């Protein structure tokens, strides 16, 4: 029996390693702070990846009914910086005492102490793709919609260390009751399956707060140098400048990004997110080439499709359409309407001309009715929406698991794998 003990311990250690993979933002201000693997019918701990889920399952990680204690806020010092805790395991953070397994490595600055880099989806520091924080100026979590969030800070070397700094722009004060924030991460395509990470938390702006309201956010666009896809030079005219939304990708419904399996969107310069505070968030988001030409001064400007390659939607700049993607996702946020419209897809590879921002044919992006019609008192700059385009998603419930989604097979997928030299032997 004693001989079998080391083998048993090895098995337990291996299981523990697998169970604590992936990463999450950890703070007492977060939703789902005390959620365990047994809270839901499926493993829905904060560090579990999100993919192919219904809107209610991925939005705030499905943790809206597990709020922080009254008065717990993550403080954002206006014009300063803040330290955040990002880890694969709550037990490896300063909050280990409330972890079901207790202390599992606290004291290390690794996001996953004692585990290989594949557990936090990277092959090395050159393979990290960045993460971000976004803010919504609404105190009631049930009022927060996807387009309310504005990305205000990015860290381009994330996930790499447990202690991760975020620079804070001169944000205006939150309303009474505070703001809502969220941490977002999409890892490298060559270090795991296609998925996103989102953890919501209560936050408030402190210190010498600003007075300028945030602009109306627009969807980010692929515009940076992309040598892996034969684009050695950036296409700045294709960037979204100004306030930008987070990137909602690879879900069953609620996507605003439609890149395919091997073209993941990232919170780095490839999508117009520079490292540090996003100090352009005080202007409305708009496609750079349209702004420079004066064609569109704000994302609600209507562009004549007969004279421009880009047509604007009724709320944000239209994204170019492309062929059907492998990623599952409906084109709009859930609504009660029985009507539906086609949603645009983002262009993984911008046109060769810097002045061209999309394909000739575009379709308007659907937005939630509440976003298009709500009169908000938040410091997000108001814009006029000519018409609310509403879509419905009537997708049935699914049964997600914490395991990463298997990759597509077939000749095309295998060619893509070989082309990009994927490192799949330790992927999750």
Curated annotation (Swiss-Prot):
<feature type="compositionally biased region" description="Basic and acidic residues">
    <location>
        <begin position="223"/>
        <end position="232"/>
    </location>
</feature>
<keyword id="KW-0964">Secreted</keyword>
<feature type="compositionally biased region" description="Basic residues">
    <location>
        <begin position="414"/>
        <end position="428"/>
    </location>
</feature>
<keyword id="KW-0186">Copper</keyword>
<feature type="glycosylation site" description="N-linked (GlcNAc...) asparagine">
    <location>
        <position position="238"/>
    </location>
</feature>
<keyword id="KW-0479">Metal-binding</keyword>
<comment type="similarity">
    <text>Belongs to the polysaccharide monooxygenase AA14 family.</text>
</comment>
<dbReference type="InterPro" id="IPR054497">
    <property type="entry name" value="LPMO_AA14"/>
</dbReference>
<dbReference type="GO" id="GO:0004497">
    <property type="term" value="F:monooxygenase activity"/>
</dbReference>
<feature type="signal peptide">
    <location>
        <begin position="1"/>
        <end position="21"/>
    </location>
</feature>
<feature type="disulfide bond">
    <location>
        <begin position="88"/>
        <end position="112"/>
    </location>
</feature>
<feature type="disulfide bond">
    <location>
        <begin position="181"/>
        <end position="203"/>
    </location>
</feature>
<feature type="disulfide bond">
    <location>
        <begin position="174"/>
        <end position="179"/>
    </location>
</feature>
<comment type="function">
    <text>Lytic polysaccharide monooxygenase (LPMO) showing oxidase and peroxidase activities that are common for LPMOs. Catalysis by LPMOs requires the reduction of the active-site copper from Cu(II) to Cu(I) by a reducing agent and H(2)O(2) or O(2) as a cosubstrate. Shows no activity on cellulose-associated xylan or any other tested polysaccharide substrate, meaning that the substrate rremains unknown.</text>
</comment>
<feature type="glycosylation site" description="N-linked (GlcNAc...) asparagine">
    <location>
        <position position="155"/>
    </location>
</feature>
<keyword id="KW-0325">Glycoprotein</keyword>
<feature type="region of interest" description="Disordered">
    <location>
        <begin position="292"/>
        <end position="428"/>
    </location>
</feature>
<dbReference type="Pfam" id="PF22810">
    <property type="entry name" value="LPMO_AA14"/>
</dbReference>
<feature type="glycosylation site" description="N-linked (GlcNAc...) asparagine">
    <location>
        <position position="34"/>
    </location>
</feature>
<keyword id="KW-0503">Monooxygenase</keyword>
<keyword id="KW-0732">Signal</keyword>
<dbReference type="GO" id="GO:0005576">
    <property type="term" value="C:extracellular region"/>
</dbReference>
<feature type="glycosylation site" description="N-linked (GlcNAc...) asparagine">
    <location>
        <position position="52"/>
    </location>
</feature>
<feature type="disulfide bond">
    <location>
        <begin position="131"/>
        <end position="158"/>
    </location>
</feature>
<keyword id="KW-0560">Oxidoreductase</keyword>
<feature type="region of interest" description="Disordered">
    <location>
        <begin position="216"/>
        <end position="239"/>
    </location>
</feature>
<feature type="compositionally biased region" description="Polar residues">
    <location>
        <begin position="380"/>
        <end position="402"/>
    </location>
</feature>
<dbReference type="GO" id="GO:0046872">
    <property type="term" value="F:metal ion binding"/>
</dbReference>
<protein>
    <recommendedName>
        <fullName>AA14 family lytic polysaccharide monooxygenase A</fullName>
        <ecNumber>1.14.99.-</ecNumber>
    </recommendedName>
</protein>
<feature type="disulfide bond">
    <location>
        <begin position="223"/>
        <end position="239"/>
    </location>
</feature>
<feature type="compositionally biased region" description="Low complexity">
    <location>
        <begin position="292"/>
        <end position="379"/>
    </location>
</feature>
<keyword id="KW-1015">Disulfide bond</keyword>
